[in-house]
């Protein structure tokens, strides 16, 4: 990966979800989900308090996380598209 997130930013790859009709047709852009599942690819060093103390991120590379739909900025990394989000945008870590 050519990207290294800074501060509390996290690089994720959203899992592709597709809806199909009963006959098997894929409905493009038909997702009505309010959340998405993503895999954490890289994690920044964390945030700093006003006194300069470093607060480490609560997620690690490889974690599966739940993120609100529409969160983050999509960027190209090589041939793939990934998203850069803030740790505060993560709703939950999936077990």
Swiss-Prot record:
Gene Ontology biological process terms from the UniProt entry: chaperone cofactor-dependent protein refolding
CC annotations in GO: cytoplasm
Entry's localization field: Cytoplasm
Molecular-function annotations in GO: ATP binding; metal ion binding; protein folding chaperone; protein-folding chaperone binding; unfolded protein binding
Record keywords: Chaperone, Cytoplasm
Main location, first listed in the record: cytoplasm
Pfam families on file: Cpn10 (PF00166)
PROSITE patterns: CHAPERONINS_CPN10 (PS00681)
Entry-linked Gene3D superfamilies: GroES chaperonin
Biological function: Together with the chaperonin GroEL, plays an essential role in assisting protein folding. The GroEL-GroES system forms a nano-cage that allows encapsulation of the non-native substrate proteins and provides a physical environment optimized to promote and accelerate protein folding. GroES binds to the apical surface of the GroEL ring, thereby capping the opening of the GroEL channel.
Family affiliation: Belongs to the GroES chaperonin family.
Assembly mode: Heptamer of 7 subunits arranged in a ring. Interacts with the chaperonin GroEL.
Name under which the protein is recorded: Co-chaperonin GroES
């Amino acid at each position: 990966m050519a990207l290294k997130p800074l501060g509390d930013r996290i690089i994720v790859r959203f899992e592709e979800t597709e809806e199909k009709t009963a006959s098997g047709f894929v409905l493009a852009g038909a997702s009505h989900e309010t959340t998405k599942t993503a895999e954490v690819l890289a994690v920044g060093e964390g945030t700093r308090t006003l006194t300069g103390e470093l607060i480490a991120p609560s997620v690690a590379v490889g974690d599966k996380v739940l993120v609100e739909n529409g969160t983050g900025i999509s960027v190209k990394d090589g041939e793939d598209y990934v998203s850069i989000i803030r740790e505060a945008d993560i709703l939950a870590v999936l077990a």
